[in-house]
Amino acid sequence: MYLAILTLPLLSATVAGFLGRKIGKTGSHLITCSSLVLTALLALVAFYEVGLCGSPVSIKLMSWIDSEFLLVSWGFIYDSLTVSMLLPVLIVSALVHIYSTNYMSEDPHNQRFFAYLSMFTFFMLMLVTGDNYLVMFIGWEGVGISSYLLINFWFTRLQANKAAIKALVMNRVGDWGFSIGLWAIFWTFGNLDFTTVFSLAPFINEELITIISICLLVAAMGKSAQIGLHTWLPDAMEGPTPVSALIHAATMVTAGVYLLLRSSPILEFGSTALILITWVGALTAFFAATTGLLQNDLKRVIAYSTCSQLGLLFLVCGLSQYNVALFHLVNHAWFKALLFLSAGSVIHAMNDEQDLRKFGGLSRLLPFTYSMMVIGSLSLMALPFLTGFYSKDLIIELAYGHYSFSGNLVYWLASVAAVFTAMYSIRSLYLTFLGYPNGPKINYNNIHEAPLIMAIPLVVLAVFSIFFGYVTKDLFVGMGTDFYNNALFIHPNHSILVDTEFGLPMSMKFLPLIGSLLGTFGVLAIYWIFDELPNKFISTKLGRGIYRFFNQKYYFDNIYNNLLNKFLNFGYTTNKILDRGAIELVGPYGLVNVFKSASNKVSGLDSGFIPTYAMYIFNGLILFITLIFFIGDPRLFVLLLWAVFLLPNNTTQK
């Protein structure tokens, strides 16, 4: 069963990819969807056996690298962390496959699309089930390649090409960090197996642990789109909407957080790295929330909400509360997939229009989609008793319960981010469903609600977005839960969950919720009562500057294009002049060219004309005679003559 969880997505991807022309579009739909649904059911069984019954499973397939210094095998582990990750990965992937059968029905490349989706899922499964860092790295790279193929699925679109290349290049930075981290782990521990590395981590020098932790942080920042390496995530919206749902909810961006969760036995002994992780997460959450407030593309608004929520996950990992991070990661998958698929339903109904300014008045025309979008947005805002409430507010409370300088600051940053999250969620809902109709008339004339095959995944995700957090709260973050066993490690000195639960002032617990409600009513008041206020504010010089700053994403793209590219071009020029210029000129190519040129010139002296040879003899004689004037001692001149006339005779005798 456990091997089937891995092999079924790979089998469906292979069949749809290589036999797509034989089985057709319907056959590809049937094989990929049935395989993913079956795999999701097996994941539920695995969650029951491993997570609830406490029976972890380890599988060793075969030896991969067997040398004197390194032993790596194709091994897979199913513990509480793995099966918890399998739930969002496989359930969301199965629902996305079902949803895509109708959403992508008119596309001529259905077989390729579903093959890519299944391959994406397979590599994510390899990433979360591998029992050593090298197998994880294979899945890590596979997820990156699959995301490139899916973002660039419509490869005739220039923007899709740029977005895919951007995603690949930005993730290369994270891959660089992971690669160095792998070498550092091998050099430090002599092994890449999780059990060996984690057992030895408490006895390793803290400086080495910090270096390894920072390398893993860089890797996670690239894959999970943290500030500085986040610019690829909004541009990834150029791919089909089901791809966006899969990338943002279950795969790709969660890989970086999973790396931190799996490496918790290492991170816990690198205090400096934990502080860095906390601040990276807090700054990302604040940055993404403020940026999403003034975006005009529906999918980009949701993309920045993903970036902000990932920042909260990093924040709580830096606070060493890995169980809360896993809980919010799973919760986030449900309502984020619901938001993206609901947005896809709106875009599908409005003739592929994505601009919020060209929507409006859709609540009466798309009541079902409107209901789904409201559920997803309220769960994202952490409205009480929805799924997001049980984990998101707990993260913010833990920041204050850390009782440190960093903890207090990141608490306020996260609280402000929560306020902006509520504001851009309500803004996107209002502009899409409640405002005045602003789109072309033809879009409204042809509008249609999502068909049944697209509605079923939305209903399932809505149920998870409402009830999952309440049902599983005690399992994931309850006091004294033994769900994790040894899958996660929290140093006893870093355990603050009990203090936060019972020792935090009630005012600090309610502050994020009150701020979110104030932000909600503030946005509604601006659009319903003071509807002219936004236009008046933007018409001022200060308003234009603020709007442009947030709308242009803090000018990160401009900075990279105008400043970073200059350094890269300088490096390219230096490489071209030195490595491929001066070094080659005086190196092998230069020597070969010098000898070739000299030999060509010497061979050109052989003209075949007797007068030319007579001139050579005469010039040689003149040169020989002039040596008398340069050699002061006549005995040296006699010795020279003797050498000239006797050397040929010696050669002849031999």
UniProtKB/Swiss-Prot annotation:
Catalysed reactions listed for this entry: a ubiquinone + NADH + 5 H(+)(in) = a ubiquinol + NAD(+) + 4 H(+)(out)
Any one annotated GO CC term: mitochondrial inner membrane
Membrane-crossing segments per the record: 1-21, 30-50, 76-96, 113-133, 135-155, 178-198, 200-220, 241-261, 274-294, 301-320, 324-346, 365-385, 406-426, 451-471, 510-530, 612-632
Enzyme category, top tier: translocase
Keyword Membrane belongs to the record: yes
EC number(s) reported in the record: 7.1.1.2
Gene3D superfamilies: 1.20.5.2700
UniProt KW Zinc keyword: no
Key words of the record: Electron transport, Membrane, Mitochondrion, Mitochondrion inner membrane, NAD, Respiratory chain, Translocase, Transmembrane, Transmembrane helix, Transport, Ubiquinone
Classification via Pfam families: NADH5_C (PF06455), Proton_antipo_M (PF00361), Proton_antipo_N (PF00662)
Single GO biological process annotation from the record: ATP synthesis coupled electron transport
A molecular-function term among this protein's GO annotations: NADH dehydrogenase (ubiquinone) activity
Role, per record: Core subunit of the mitochondrial membrane respiratory chain NADH dehydrogenase (Complex I) that is believed to belong to the minimal assembly required for catalysis. Complex I functions in the transfer of electrons from NADH to the respiratory chain. The immediate electron acceptor for the enzyme is believed to be ubiquinone.
Family, similarity comment: Belongs to the complex I subunit 5 family.
Protein name (Swiss-Prot/TrEMBL): NADH-ubiquinone oxidoreductase chain 5
Annotated source species: Rhizopus stolonifer (Rhizopus nigricans)
Gene field: ND5
